[in-house]
Regions:
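A domain-level signal for caspase-like cysteine endopeptidase catalytic cores
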Residues: 1-85, 115
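Catalytic cores of nucleophile-dependent amide-cleaving enzymes
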Residues: 59-142
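Caspase-like cysteine protease fold
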Residues: 78-97, 148-197
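Active-site proximal helix-loop segment of RNase H-like, two-metal nucleases, encompassing DDE(D)
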Residues: 139-151
Length: 197
C-alpha cells in the first residue's frame, strides 16, 4: 500500500488503517501480508515491487489522467514528485513477478488503467473522475474486505461500489475495473482458503 499526500490534504493514514482493519477481520486474514508505505516515494514504489513482490499494488494519493504524485524526501508540505502514467507502468513492469492487480485510489486515474492491463497487469482499478477522500476510503476498505473473504475481483469491486451506494453517495460508479482479454474478473479469486495439511 503506497500512500502519498505531499500537501497533507488527504487522509492516507486513515485509509491504510481502514484497509488493515478490513483485512484483519476477514476469513482469510492469515494469508495476507500488508506492506504499508505512508509518505511513499518513487524509491518506495521500486523497492516494494522488487523486494516485497506484491500481488496487489494499491496507491492512494493525487493523480489525474496522465500522472501520479508521489512524495519527496521532505518533512514539510511540498508539491510532490510528478510521475507520468507511462513511468508508473514501467515501474510496475520492472520485476520478474509483476502484480496481478493495481488499484489507483486517486482522482481521474481510470484513464490510466487500460494501458496498465494492456501492457502490465491482468487487472486494474481507477477512478473515473474526482472522488471525495471519504468515498475513496470506503470503497477501498470494502474492496479489500471482500478480497480477503475469498471473493472474486469482480465481486469485490461491486461490493466496494455498493458500499458507496448504500452510504447514499453519488460516486458509486466512479471506481472502474479493467482487465486484460485473457482473464475473467468473475472467476479470478486472489485469496483462497488453504488446504488443511
Amino acid at each position: 500500500m503506497l500512500g502519498a499526500s505531499s500537501e497533507g490534504d488527504l487522509r492516507v493514514g486513515r485509509e491504510q488503517k481502514r484497509i488493515r482493519a478490513a483485512v484483519e477481520s476477514a476469513l482469510h486474514r492469515d494469508q495476507i501480508e500488508l506492506d504499508v508505505r505512508p509518505a511513499a516515494t518513487t524509491h518506495d514504489l521500486l523497492d516494494g515491487i522488487t523486494k516485497f513482490r506484491p500481488h496487489v499494488v494499491h496507491f492512494s494519493g493525487h493523480s489525474n489522467e496522465d500522472l501520479i504524485v508521489f512524495e519527496d524526501e521532505q518533512d514539510a508540505p511540498h508539491s510532490g514528485v510528478i510521475v507520468t502514467a507511462r513511468a508508473f507502468a514501467n515501474a510496475i513492469r520492472a520485476t520478474d513477478d509483476p502484480p496481478l492487480l493495481v488499484l489507483l485510489n486517486s482522482c481521474k486515474s481510470a484513464a490510466q488503467i487500460d494501458d496498465l492491463v494492456d501492457q502490465v497487469v491482468p487487472f486494474a482499478i481507477g477512478m473515473a473522475d474526482s472522488i471525495d477522500d471519504a468515498d475513496a476510503i470506503n470503497y477501498a476498505a470494502q474492496f479489500y474486505a471482500a478480497i480477503a473473504n475469498g471473493q472474486s475481483v469482480n465481486s469485490a469491486h461491486l461490493a466496494g461500489q455498493v458500499r458507496l451506494e448504500l452510504d447514499g453517495l453519488d460516486s458509486a460508479d466512479l471506481p472502474t475495473l479493467a482487465w486484460a482479454p485473457d482473464v475473467d474478473p468473475t472467476t479470478t479469486i486472489l485469496v483462497r482458503p488453504t488446504d488443511p495439511a
